[in-house]
Each structure stands twice: as structure tokens, then as C-alpha cells.
A protein has these predicted regions:
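Conserved alpha-helix/loop element of class I SAM-dependent methyltransferases that forms part
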Residues: 37-55
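A conserved beta-strand element that flanks and buttresses the S-adenosyl-L-methionine
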Residues: 127
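Conserved class I S-adenosyl-L-methionine
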Residues: 158-181
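N-terminal, positively charged/glycine-rich alpha-helical extensions of SAM-dependent methyltransferases
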Residues: 1-26
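Short catalytic micro-motifs in class I SAM-dependent methyltransferases
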Residues: 130-134
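A short glycine-rich, Lys/Arg-flanked "PGG" loop and its adjoining helix->strand segment in the class I
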Residues: 141-153
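Class I SAM-dependent methyltransferase SAM/SAH-binding core
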Residues: 60, 66-116
């Protein structure tokens, strides 16, 4: 299979995207350049967390990759002493980077696991930031059910995701804006 270069020495082919190997070393730079408003989305998640996180909260991020977002959310909520922030990712090199990145933020724990298999505690906030697209479609509903069951009453799932527009015209607009980015 011929692999295509997608930036920062990252290669992929049809149905062959992986986060293993050296991807963790350049992930933050790559995703910031390839996903429009990626960091702005982090800021929005932090602002939304104000409505759900208190000093007794458990907060999860599934697909935490290098831990950038879970660390930002934890630092944003540092005044809520006692809150716990848990990043989950199934890819060893990403987990290693996340643990290094979050080492100076004691309220953050990084766990290597697949969200589909993880035993969630009750939580007030679960974050899925461009993660569900990497879950096989046949497993998505079961994962959504699991995340819903893990939420306390009044809790939230904040999800950013690439989606197909319901109308071809809007899909064309979104693709055009993405390509211009």
C-alpha cells in the first residue's frame, strides 16, 4: 500500500491511520495545522467546564492523545481543589507524552486504555475532542451509552467531531473552508 505524507513525517494510507510510532512527537503541531480552530476549541471546552466542574468532580477526556486539553481544563479549574482530571488513550506513545506533559499538574492522571473497555466512575464532565471518528462505527452507540451512564445527573458530554453536513451544499461549504485552512 502506498502511504501519503500528511505533514510532520506522518504518513497514512486508505484506512491505515495510526497514532503509533513517532506520531506522538509531532501530534500537537500537526493537529494544530490541520484542524481549523483547534486551540480555540480547547478554550471553549475550558469555558464550558465552568458550568459542570466543582471541587468533588471527576472529569474524563477520552482520546487524550498528548494530554494538552485535559491539562488545560485542569489548570482552568485549579481553584476547584479536589477535582480530578483523567485522560484516557489507547496508544502507548501518546500516553507517555501525556504523562510527561501533565507531570506538573497533580490533579491530572493519564491512563492507557481504550474507552470502550474502561470502567468509568460517575463523572460531571466527559470530553471527546475529535475522538469518536477513530472508533469503529459498529462500536459507537455502545460507547455513547457507556458515557451517558457514567455521567452524574446534570453532567455533560462535550464532543467536538468532524461530521457530514445534512445538506450537500453545507457539506461543500465546510469542505471548502477546511481546504482553505
Amino acid at each position: 500500500m502506498k502511504l501519503a505524507k500528511v505533514g510532520q513525517d506522518i504518513e497514512t494510507g486508505n484506512a491505515a491511520w495510526t497514532f503509533d510510532g513517532k506520531v506522538a512527537d509531532t501530534f500537537v503541531s500537526h493537529v494544530s495545522q490541520s484542524v481549523p480552530l483547534y486551540e480555540k476549541g480547547h478554550d471553549l471546552v475550558c469555558q464550558l467546564s465552568d458550568y459542570f466542574v466543582d471541587k468533588t468532580s471527576t472529569v474524563y477526556e477520552i482520546g487524550t492523545s498528548t494530554g494538552e486539553l485535559i491539562k488545560k481544563v485542569a489548570q482552568h479549574n485549579a481553584h476547584r481543589e479536589g477535582a480530578r482530571f483523567i485522560g484516557i488513550d489507547p496508544v502507548g506513545p501518546m500516553v507517555e507524552k501525556a504523562k510527561e506533559h501533565c507531570a506538573d499538574t497533580p490533579s491530572v492522571t493519564i491512563i492507557e486504555d481504550d474507552a470502550r473497555n474502561f470502567e468509568f466512575e460517575k463523572s460531571d464532565l466527559i470530553i471527546s475532542y475529535y475522538t469518536i471518528q477513530f472508533i469503529p462505527p459498529r462500536d459507537r452507540q455502545q460507547l455513547f451509552d457507556k458515557l451517558y451512564e457514567a455521567l452524574n445527573w446534570g453532567g455533560a458530554l462535550i464532543m467536538f467531531e468532524k461530521v457530514r453536513a445534512p445538506d450537500a451544499r453545507f457539506q461543500d461549504m465546510a469542505v471548502s473552508m477546511y481546504n482553505e485552512f
